[in-house]
Amino acid sequence: MTDLLNRLSTARPSETELQAMWSEDRRQALLDRIEETHDARPSRHRYGTAIGLVAAAATAFLVIPAAVDTPSAAATDLRSLALTAASYEGSVLEQGTWLHEQSTSVQRDSRTLSDGAVYERERETWTRWDGRTLLIERDPSAGWTSYDVINGSRAISDPEAPAFDDPASYQDPTPQFAAALPDTAEGLLSYLDGRVFGSSSHEEAMYSALVGLATSHTLPPDTLAATYEALATVEGVTTDNVRVEGQPAVEVGFRDDLSGSVETMTVDAATGQVLAVKTDSSQSSYTSTTTLSQVVPEIPAAVVDAFSEHDEGIRYTASGDPMQN
């Protein structure tokens, strides 16, 4: 996490650079786009009342005018993240590059409803433009490491080896798929509205879909910004200002009233990049934290060699021997 925050801090432009990149006209144009999305939603007016004040021989009336439909605190936070994400100047994925990421995950099963088991994983991936992914996965407690290729053959030495013809989707986006998504909140909402499924409510399904896109780290800056703008329109989404290793962050959450589970996504307030996701339910809790996310031109030779020396679907001990079942 520290390495990722350091990279994000380095990547973030200075205030002088931001002012140069974001002229008053450009900032106003983006704000106008956000307000257009907000204004398109049905307003919920709150009407004031007339209060009669009687004093001696005179009667006066105080009328409270109809209140403006102001954005919620969550919507304000999310639109701020959208502005930040749109101005992010880090490297952007394109054909010929790889997304290199490191992450850790912890699942804790309930001691009351389950066996209380704890599962830890460390993952390192290299994802190509078309979705071909090299995955190194480790279990620190069990002491094993595996080397698998997702959506592609093990011809690692051939950088042009094609990915398998597995269709990408909003649930499993490739960089190529993400680049073609709508880059406005209205467009994203329209695209997802008829596609999301499998949840206890449409709002929860939309939240999960938008968070899944954001946490993939495959979205171009404008599309990531549109994702936050879209989340600002989903009923039930909450935000909380938190700190991660001393740095300001925003926790974006949604509670499923039917199951009681709570999903959260933690976003770096300075860059708009996703740091972690978490799901809490009565059965278990699951947290996945991204510790490194960067765009690289190629896979290191040592990694290519490691995949050439290890077989698919085999777990290896620290000494490099296959584990016995």
Regions found by a protein language model. Give the residues of each.
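Intrinsically disordered, low-complexity prosegments and terminal tails associated
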Residues: 52-325
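N-terminal export/targeting signals for secretion/compartment entry
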Residues: 1-80
